[in-house]
Structure formats: C-alpha cells, structure tokens
Regions:
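Asp-based, Mg2+/Mn2+-dependent phosphohydrolase catalytic module
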Residues: 6, 81, 85-186
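Conserved phosphate-coupling serine/threonine residues in phosphotransfer and NTP-handling enzymes
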Residues: 77-79
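N-terminal helical cap/lid subdomain that shapes the substrate entry/recognition surface
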Residues: 1-61, 65-69, 82
C-alpha cells in the first residue's frame, strides 16, 4: 500500500524487517511476506541507498573535528550491516571509525544494548566516557539500556517530543552544539 510521506519517519528505525512489517497492509504482516519484500528490497537498496540521502548539515565537519581531537567515533545502526558500511564509507571516507555496526546476524537490533557493548569492547572505553548521539526514541532507549550518556538531535526523523520522553542528558538543535558540548566536557 502507499503511505503518506511523513508516516515513513515512524516506520524506520527498528531494522528493515520491522519497516516492512509496518508498511505491509493489515492482514498481510506475516513473516513470509516480510522476507519476500526483504529479498526484493536488498538488491535494489544495495545499488541505490545513497541516491536520495545526504549527511545532515555540519556532520562531516563535526566528525572531522572530533577525529582531530582524538575522540573515537563509532556507528550503531539498525540498517543491515552491508548498507551501513557502504553509506559510511561513501559519505565519510576520511573518517576513521573504531566500529561501524549495522544489523548483524545473531545480534539483537536496537534498543537492545548489545551493539553498544560490542563497540565499548572494541574501543576499550568505559561507559562513562561515551556520548551516544541519536535522532529517535530507539536511540535514546538504546543509550539508557546500555547505561551511557544520551544526546538527542532534533534534525533527524523523529520529533523533539519523542526524544524528550526518554529524558536524555542532552538535546541539541545543531551539529555545532555537539561540538561545543564535547569541547566543554573533554
């Protein structure tokens, strides 16, 4: 079925299987249909995932700044692993990420904290040294589940009100605010 464009913002964020389940018509939300749609979607998305996407304003500069300050960077996404790696390599080739993790076989999707724990282990850092930045309630819940500091961003897919429900330590309106926040706490 077709959906209003703004509805898609609330379908994404929990992995592609959940996206397909939410998008399918009532009565057709079966695992079989989800897997059928997934099988058709992945080859297309593998080729076209960067067609209409762009980094948000200021993100490339923010990542470069953080890297220059010696801060370890990581990605924890609910996109499937291959798509996550491809998008990050395409948009941020100059950034050295400690980890780039998407949805992986045998690892629960966010808000399960497993992906954060995997990153902590790879980075060899303590929870109290982490700032988990995200644009959705799923991200804020992931940070809470991992017991790391959460920073919600208001320019993503979800409204500020969704972020506020999770009481993150910070909510920011621009990438520059993250830079100031990190500068003041380092």
């Amino acid at each position: 079925p077709t959906h209003e464009e703004q509805e898609y913002n609330f379908m994404v964020g929990n992995g592609i299987n959940k996206l397909f389940e939410r998008a399918l018509p009532e009565g057709e939300k079966t695992e079989e249909n989800v897997l059928r749609v997934r099988k058709e979607f992945i080859p297309y998305y593998d080729v076209h995932n960067a067609d209409d996407s762009r980094p948000y304003p200021g993100i490339s500069e923010l990542l470069s700044y953080l890297q220059s300050e010696g801060i370890q960077l990581a990605v924890a996404s609910n996109k499937y692993q291959a798509a996550t790696e491809k998008l990050i390599a395409y948009y941020f080739p100059e950034i050295r990420f400690t980890a780039v993790f998407g949805q992986r076989e045998g690892v629960n999707v966010k808000p399960d904290p497993a992906v954060v724990f995997d990153i902590l282990k790879l980075a060899d850092v303590e929870k109290e040294d982490v700032l988990y930045v995200g644009d959705s309630g799923v991200d804020m819940q992931t940070a809470a589940n991992a017991n790391v500091t959460a920073c919600g961003i208001t320019w993503g897919f979800r409204p500020r009100t969704e972020l506020e429900k999770f009481n993150p330590a910070y909510i920011v309106d621009s990438a520059k605010e993250i830079e100031k926040l990190v500068s003041s706490t380092c």
